């Protein structure tokens, strides 16, 4: 069991401006609560046409979590996974993964995604706790209004204004981690944050924020064998399996295995590999900062410029595990807004610094010590010597490995560190491990509320018209390993990949504004693809201002990210190639599915070892097991969703109820599959070439699943205020993968627990100047699928508590 003990020291200077509350005590403040993310205009949260959740400043103040980012784990309908310390990924309604490209993360309406990944790098560009006004969460499709990568929803983090929240604030979080950790001593975790904001006049203001986080990540130490049956035909399992491939051991994967003839039988042999803890320093050191300037032309018009950046030293997970070192990401943003117009342009840029791929590092340290051909020859020699001396097969295999590994680089030695440093700078994963990516995108968008000023006469008819347009252009800079220019003779020249979209939203109020009808039509056009329509229709019925029923139906598309479209990565003998025709022409047409090749090779091996067939005879017998690839080039994903919901207040506004139900259908999931191409034009030779790993080219291709997938779920949240300031909250979320039609094995993992439950009890001023909260979280076990590993995630229960004491004379709070 891992324990986390924390002490948070929060200092807020006397310059901070307190916000006045005029809500009656002990009532749930929902009648006055306004949100903007659901419809891109200000509206009551009770009358939102789709599910929206809010984490308020009060929620953040009372959370028993370490930060507002951690507190989001308790939001109704939101799933949060933690691939590493300081790295959290949001998702809703299924199909979670560590680089979620279906769920957007915004700060003041600007997407903070990493350009080359298509999703946010954890909370790297998120505000610190001191600058958060509130967080709005859409746990469901938002494509009609936002496009982008929002088929599963979005989080919009809204920061404080320096006109209304001024002064200096400092926060220090300190924790002890790694209790009862056999891989590490107890470690110190610290996070230091500050915010300074000042209005220099009624027109000009600025703010500056920064945070420094330092800690030590938990060591990934799962050594479960991913290839336990490789030598089952020889009766070798467990520790005797010479093709061992541990989850967090790198250099012994499929591309580092070979079938060799030993003593008259064929054995699958893998190189030895290195454990993750030997390849990466798990020290976490993240720095982030932002600044924003504001100029008001008048009370209705304002121009602002923002800049935020982060540098990361952290562990990061995709299909492989990475060590991020000197990773740099930044955003410049310019925004103008008045009563009817909002326009913004922002640029996201990233550089991966000296980051590296842990798998490639492990396998290429091995190859720097000894080339594969030499190592396998030495293995044969060692095996033959051992058997000649009378050793049994398992012992002979062990002695053969020791002989072949003699002189191998040992972790912690100067020689090992030297070769690791050398490979860290080689940007080719066939011979090195460097991750050297520099990518950018430019996003420009504008929206106009036509009825606010230009067609204000429509207001009398209860009509509101909102229209918007946006463009995102990626500037892709080939690095020789991750990306190449597929259309230019110079494959290292920069190129672009863009998408343009626009929407019109019309809302009509009827029955004395008790009934609200809304229709949204969005059109998106991306390079390489035809235009796609994303419509949404919704209805909200409010018999009174405390009871609100809603229903909506919508569809959306997700276009491939630049990595899915244009990647060209040499990854340890397997080339990962983007799914556009300009990248992968000829591969889909000539490839065989790797799963069928594995079955074919296993059957041939069994017939050679157990049925006395020659290799040629065994290949001929089993060649029908080989399956030609039937996947093709990328097309956009499509999702259709129906949602109904209810928000209401009861017991004189003391009780708030929020519930929703949804049903979604997905088609054309963008996913990866492995396929190999035999290195021969002679069709008769293909089976023999596909039995020999050295005579085939291995690919991991981005393509679309042929499955049609249906999911449904619901959530229920309750908030009850009572007894002079007590607040009790509880919510539950149910998510279900209902059916997969035309199942082809290429579906993304659902990777979502069926049940999540959160509850809390809090009290402001439990005693004089003392706030207290206790929180509870439970989720059931679920099955996780990814290219790194598959397996069960155990159910877990968390109980968190906090007591905060305010020292009024020092304007200081100890939590």
Where are these regions (language model features)?
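Extracytoplasmic beta-strand/coil segments of soluble accessory domains associated
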Residues: 44, 52, 69-114, 133-134
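Membrane-embedded beta-barrel scaffold of Gram-negative outer-membrane proteins
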Residues: 582-697
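Surface-exposed extracellular loop regions of Gram-negative outer-membrane beta-barrel proteins
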Residues: 286-330, 466-479, 493-540, 718-734
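Conserved C-terminal beta-signal and adjacent last beta-strands/turns
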Residues: 197-203, 209-215, 284, 328-332, ...
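Short, acidic, small-residue-rich periplasmic hinge/interaction motif at the N-terminus
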Residues: 20-59
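Gram-negative outer-membrane beta-barrel transporters
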Residues: 468-470, 509-511, 651, 656-786
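Outer-membrane beta-barrel translocator/receptor signature
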Residues: 130-133, 139, 144-228, 285-289
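Short acidic/polar hinge/loop motifs at secondary-structure boundaries
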Residues: 112-141
């Amino acid at each position: 069991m891992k324990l986390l003990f924390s002490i948070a020291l929060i200092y807020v200077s006397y310059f901070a401006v307190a916000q006045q509350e005029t809500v009656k005590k002990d009532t749930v403040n929902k009648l006055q609560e306004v949100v903007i993310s659901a419809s891109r205009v200000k509206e009551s949260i009770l009358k939102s046409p789709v599910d929206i959740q809010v984490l308020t400043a009060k929620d953040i103040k009372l959370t028993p979590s370490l930060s507002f980012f951690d507190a989001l784990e308790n939001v109704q309908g939101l799933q949060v996974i933690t691939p590493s310390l300081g790295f959290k990924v949001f998702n809703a309604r299924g199909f979670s993964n560590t680089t979620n490209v279906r769920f957007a993360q915004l700060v003041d309406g600007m997407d903070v995604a990493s350009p080359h990944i298509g999703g946010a790098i954890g909370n790297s560009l998120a505000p610190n706790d001191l600058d958060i006004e509130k967080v709005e969460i859409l746990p469901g499709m938002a494509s009609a209004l936002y496009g982008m990568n929002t088929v599963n929803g979005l989080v919009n983090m809204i920061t404080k204004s320096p006109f209304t929240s001024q002064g200096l604030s400092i926060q220090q979080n300190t924790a002890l981690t790694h209790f009862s950790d056999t891989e590490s001593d107890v470690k110190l975790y610290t996070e230091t944050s500050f915010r300074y904001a000042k209005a220099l006049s009624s027109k000009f203001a600025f703010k500056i924020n920064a945070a420094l986080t330092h800690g030590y990540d938990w060591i990934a130490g799962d050594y479960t064998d991913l290839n336990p049956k490789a030598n089952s035909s020889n009766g070798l399992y467990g520790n005797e399996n010479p093709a061992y491939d541990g989850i967090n051991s790198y250099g012994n994967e499929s591309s580092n295995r070979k079938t060799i003839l030993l003593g008259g039988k064929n054995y699958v042999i893998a190189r030895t590999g290195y454990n993750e803890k030997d390849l990466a320093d798990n020290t976490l050191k993240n720095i982030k900062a932002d600044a924003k300037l504001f100029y008001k032309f008048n009370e209705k018009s304002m121009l602002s410029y923002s800049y935020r950046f982060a540098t990361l030293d952290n562990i990061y997970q995709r299909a492989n595990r990475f060590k991020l070192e000197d990773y740099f990401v930044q955003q410049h943003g310019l925004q103008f807004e008045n009563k009817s117009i909002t326009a913004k342009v922002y640029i996201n840029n990233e550089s991966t610094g000296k980051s590296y791929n842990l798998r490639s590092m492990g396998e290429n340290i091995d190859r720097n010590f000894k080339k594969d051909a030499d190592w396998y020859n030495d293995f044969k020699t060692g095996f033959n010597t051992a058997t000649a001396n009378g050793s049994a097969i398992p012992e002979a295999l062990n002695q053969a490995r020791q002989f072949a590994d003699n002189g191998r680089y040992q972790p912690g030695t100067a020689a090992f560190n030297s070769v690791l440093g050398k490979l860290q700078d080689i940007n080719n994963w066939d011979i090195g491990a460097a991750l050297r990516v520099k990518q950018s995108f430019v996003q420009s968008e504008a929206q106009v509320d036509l009825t606010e000023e230009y067609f204000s006469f429509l207001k009398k008819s209860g009509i509101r018209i909102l229209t918007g347009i946006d463009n995102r252009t990626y500037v892709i800079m080939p690095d020789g390993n991750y990306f190449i220019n597929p259309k230019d003779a110079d494959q290292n020249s920069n190129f672009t990949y863009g998408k343009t979209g626009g929407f019109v939203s019309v809302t009509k109020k009827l029955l004395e504004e008790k009934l609200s009808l809304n229709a949204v039509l969005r059109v998106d056009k991306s390079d390489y693809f035809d235009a796609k329509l994303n419509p949404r229709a919704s209805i909200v019925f409010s018999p009174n201002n405390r009871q609100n029923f809603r229903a909506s139906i919508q569809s959306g598309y997700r276009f491939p990210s630049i990595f899915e479209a244009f990647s060209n990565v040499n990854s340890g003998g397997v080339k990962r190639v983007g799914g556009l025709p300009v990248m992968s022409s000829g591969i889909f047409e000539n490839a065989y599915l790797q799963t069928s090749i594995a079955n074919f090779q296993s059957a041939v091996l069994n017939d050679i070892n157990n049925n006395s067939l020659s290799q040629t005879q065994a290949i001929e017998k089993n060649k029908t097991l080989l399956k030609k690839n039937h996947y093709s080039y990328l097309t956009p994903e499509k999702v259709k969703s129906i949602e109904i919901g209810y928000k209401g207040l009861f017991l004189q506004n003391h009780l708030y109820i929020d519930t929703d139900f949804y049903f979604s259908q997905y088609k054309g999931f963008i996913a990866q599959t492995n396929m190999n191409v035999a290195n021969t034009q002679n069709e008769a030779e293909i089976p023999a070439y596909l039995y020999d790993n050295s005579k085939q080219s291995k690919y991991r291709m981005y393509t679309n699943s042929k499955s049609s997938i249906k999911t449904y779920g619901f959530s229920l949240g309750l908030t009850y205020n009572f007894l002079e300031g007590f607040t009790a909250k509880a919510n539950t979320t149910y998510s279900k993968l209902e059916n997969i039609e035309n199942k082809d094995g290429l579906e993304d993992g659902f990777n979502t627990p069926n049940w999540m439950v959160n509850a809390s009890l809090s009290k402001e001023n439990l005693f004089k100047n003392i706030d207290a909260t206790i929180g509870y979280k439970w989720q059931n076990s679920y099955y996780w699928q990814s290219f790194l590993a598959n397996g069960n995630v155990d159910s877990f229960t968390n109980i968190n508590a906090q007591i905060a004491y305010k020292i009024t004379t020092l304007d200081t709070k100890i939590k």
